[in-house]
Amino acid sequence: MSKEIREMIDKVKSFNQFVNENVSNITYKKSVDEDRTTITAFINNKKVGSLSMGVLFDAYQYEFDDVFDEDTFDEIYPDSEIVKIEHIEVDDNYKNSGIGSELMKRGMELMKKNGYNQFYLNASPMGFKGLGTMDLVEFYKKFGFKELLNQGHNVLMGVVF
């Protein structure tokens, strides 16, 4: 093995160790305003990711009336209150480190503890560098989400616990 290849391998190992050490030292903070809950991940006081969600009290009227008829909507979501996961982001340097999964897990657990068991989101690559719609769909399926409607550029997904 050449010296250059060995040096590259050592650099990759060093970087992986750095990322793993930093990822284990993540601090999560929750903030709540009148209509949105945000969970933010920090490493050494630097924001590395966040998840924003809000409760929709008349979701059919505001989100679904042009997508499903009301009977179909009521079959999918029997209760009127639905948590919409509005936005999730992870710093490019920390993608694939588990931060996004941890944000989803913490956010959903928090909302379930507060009595909400229905969730909805748009799987759309807008703002996700290097990820396609189907990559996001597969990510959200890990949390129980199912495809409700594939619109090509965007997939509506939901889960009821």
Q: Whereabouts are the PLM-identified features?
A:
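Active-site rim helix/loop that mediates acceptor-substrate recognition in acyltransferases
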Residues: 21-43, 50-52
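Conserved acetyl-CoA-binding loop-helix of GNAT-fold acetyltransferases
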Residues: 90, 96-109
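Conserved acyl-donor/pantetheine-binding loop and adjacent beta-alpha core of acyl/acetyltransferases
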Residues: 40-87
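C-terminal "cap" of GNAT-fold acetyltransferases
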Residues: 124-126, 130-137, 141-161
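Conserved GNAT acetyl-CoA-binding A-motif
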Residues: 111-131
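Short acidic, low-complexity intrinsically disordered linear motifs used
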Residues: 4-22
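Residue-level recognition of the GNAT/N-acetyltransferase active site
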Residues: 86, 91, 124
